[in-house]
Amino acid sequence: MVVIRLARGGSKKRPFFNIVATDSRNRRDGRFIERVGFYNPLASEGEEGLRVVADRLAYWQGVGAQLSPTVARLVKQNAAKAAA
C-alpha cells in the first residue's frame, strides 16, 4: 500500500522532513516513490515552513495512497492558512 508520510532529514537537533509517497513496507527514511513536499518545523518568520505540491498530492490520493495522521494534519492546517 502506498502511504504519504514524513521522512526525516536534517542534522541532530535540527529536524527537516520531506513529505514522500512510499510503500508502507519501506523504512521511514528509506526508498520512496516521489517527494511531494517538505516540512521545516524550525522555520523562522521569513522562511517557508511547509510546501506541498497539491496536484501531486491529489494524484496520489486519487490512486489510493493514504495520508499519515501527521501529514493529514499539516495539509489541513496549510489549507486553512491559505484560505484565510
Curated annotation (Swiss-Prot):
Gene Ontology BP terms: translation
InterPro entries for this protein: Ribosomal_bS16, Ribosomal_bS16_dom_sf
Coiled coil: none
Key words, A-Z: Ribonucleoprotein, Ribosomal protein
Keyword set includes Ribosomal protein: yes
An annotated GO cellular component: small ribosomal subunit
GO molecular function list: structural constituent of ribosome
Family annotation (SUPFAM superfamilies): Ribosomal protein S16
UniProt family annotation: Belongs to the bacterial ribosomal protein bS16 family.
Cited NCBIfam families: S16
Protein name: Small ribosomal subunit protein bS16
Organism of this sequence: Cupriavidus pinatubonensis (strain JMP 134 / LMG 1197) (Cupriavidus necator (strain JMP 134))
Taxonomic placement: Bacteria, Pseudomonadati, Pseudomonadota, Betaproteobacteria, Burkholderiales
